[in-house]
Amino acid sequence: MAANSQGNFDGKFEALDLAELTKKQPWWRKLFGQESGPSAEKYSVATQLVIGGVTGWCTGFVFQKVGKLAATAVGGGFFLLQLANHTGYIKVDWQRVEKDMKKAKEQLKIRKNKQIPTEVKSKAEEVVSFVKKNVLVTGGFFGGFLLGMAS
């Protein structure tokens, strides 16, 4: 399939849509490269631990701050609801609450008996595969995450 004198190619070619191909790839393949294997082959042990530790610490720190804010909001909301109930501003229909709780329990029992969807299983298998191939990065991440939660 050589080019003729005007720059046109002889023969038929199939166009490859790279945008569609990259959409189907997991995020870690985009980060570490296509079928590059474990990141241990690309980076040194220290680099992997630093990458995992720093990202883990940042995630843990943000998780801690957001968690505190969420806990404060939920706790404050419950406190205000109890205060409003005690002072008579709102009246709770406990029979209706009990009926709804029983209905929710039944739905949970039904869902418990069903199998895990295949999409969830495949995602879990991808995560397990990533963790097995990148033990140092994952270990650094979890260590950093715990440090971030503590700071």
Swiss-Prot record:
Location (main, coarse): mitochondrion
Tissue-wise expression: Highly expressed in platelet (at protein level). Expressed in liver, brain, heart and muscle.
Protein location: Mitochondrion outer membrane; Nucleus
GO CC terms of this entry: mitochondrial outer membrane; nucleus
Stored Pfam families: FUN14
Annotated GO biological process: intracellular triglyceride homeostasis; regulation of platelet activation
Family listed: Belongs to the FUN14 family.
Protein name per Swiss-Prot or TrEMBL: FUN14 domain-containing protein 2
